[in-house]
Amino acid sequence: MDNVKNDNYYIQKIKQDLEFIVVHMKDIELEELSANEILQDSMLFRMIQLSENAKKLTEEYKQERESIPWNALYGLRNRIVHDYGNVDLNVVYETLKKDIPELLEMIK
């Protein structure tokens, strides 16, 4: 990947984060996520990163892909960043296990 930061660059970064989450959460249960602070931090960081990169996509790109819940991605980042100590791990777990794989399929 070159250093040109355009829509393709940001989509590749988003895909990398989504794939990382899907691979590393594959066999993880809620109890393991709850007990593993390093795993929590890693997953939350990836969720923040994919949201940050989604914000950098052009409006044209996002409008062409209206089925992707862009606003939900931005809201996710804001909830994590602004209320980090009070993030509901049940909601995070459901997002990681259900929404993230669906989003990856939508973006592929």
Model-assigned labels for residue ranges:
Residues 1-108:
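Solvent-exposed interaction patches of small proteins and small membrane subunits
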